[in-house]
């Protein structure tokens, strides 16, 4: 929730604010592979003690309305429900924060009960710094986590993001809004990782301009229950089509899909792969294209 958002203004009791409605601390994440100084998001932190006392009524209303709009809700920063990173308000970077305990699965148990659902249609965004406690919370929740294919080829050749290590109860993405497009990412890979990726996929002789389709194929062929492919990757677009670069300002969230960019040939290839790997809905599987 943004500091200047409607809920922050209307319901300051939901957040860790002082008497003047200024944040006592703000959200972010510690230094990692994305940023040497961490990510300073600046969002106010929830007052979980208040939310629990109020039986999570704000969360129930929020989820209830979201499920009127969407079939599935991706819960961002799922690890924050186990423990969240608290950064002193006014700090210029996220380097000097600390971890505090979140509500755990108590929130989701209350959501299930209040919304009268045996299973909540939730995808848990479980990326970033994960502890054994976070892994255990995800397992106990039953929610599918996320696998990002671009994380699989990272010099180790033993990454947990390699598709042969996936369980069915996960969602595979070629990349998210925080990643480079497949084309931009492959362009910046070192020779060793490119060689390993080609060997892993059995495509040593695939032309460079077709490599994005090999990674899409890898995601489609994985055991993951759902494969999510950004449209930029289907179109084979480069760094100019990246959505967001963490810890930067000015150029993010500006890319737009223009009319006519998705051609008939691209649609045919999308359908062919989806059908080949059993990911085409039955209602359209026999439609000629």
Mark where each language-model region is.
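Alpha-amylase-like alpha-glycosidases and glucanotransferases acting on alpha-linked glucans and related
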Residues: 2-228, 232-234, 239, 245-260
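In a subset of proteins, long, contiguous C-terminal domains/tails are tracked
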Residues: 236-289
């Amino acid at each position: 929730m943004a500091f200047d958002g409607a809920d922050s203004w209307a319901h300051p009791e939901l957040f860790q604010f002082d008497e003047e409605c200024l944040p006592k601390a703000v959200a972010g994440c510690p230094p990692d592979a994305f940023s040497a100084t961490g990510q300073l998001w600046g969002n106010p932190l929830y007052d979980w003690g208040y939310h629990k006392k109020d039986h999570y009524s704000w969360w129930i209303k929020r989820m209830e309305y979201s499920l009127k709009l969407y079939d599935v809700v991706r819960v961002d920063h799922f690890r924050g429900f186990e423990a969240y990173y608290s950064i002193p308000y006014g700090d210029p970077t996220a380097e000097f924060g600390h971890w505090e305990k979140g509500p755990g699965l108590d929130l989701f148990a209350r959501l299930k009960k209040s919304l009268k659902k045996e299973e909540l249609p939730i995808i848990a965004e479980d990326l970033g710094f994960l502890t054994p406690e976070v892994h255990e919370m995800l397992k106990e929740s039953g929610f599918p986590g996320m696998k990002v294919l671009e994380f699989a080829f990272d010099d180790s050749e033993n990454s947990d993001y390699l598709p042969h290590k996936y369980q069915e109860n996960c969602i595979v993405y070629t990349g998210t809004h925080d990643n480079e497009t497949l084309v931009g990412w492959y362009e910046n890979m070192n020779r060793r990782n490119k060689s390993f990726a080609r060997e892993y996929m059995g495509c040593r002789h695939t032309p460079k301009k077709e490599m994005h389709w090999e990674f899409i194929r890898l995601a489609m062929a994985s055991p993951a229950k759902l494969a999510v492919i950004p449209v930029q990757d289907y179109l084979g677009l480069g760094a100019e089509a990246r959505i967001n670069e963490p810890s930067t300002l000015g150029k993010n969230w500006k890319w737009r899909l223009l009319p006519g960019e998705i051609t008939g040939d691209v649609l045919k290839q999308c359908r062919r792969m989806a059908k080949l790997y059993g990911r085409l809905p039955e209602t359209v599987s026999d439609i000629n294209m």
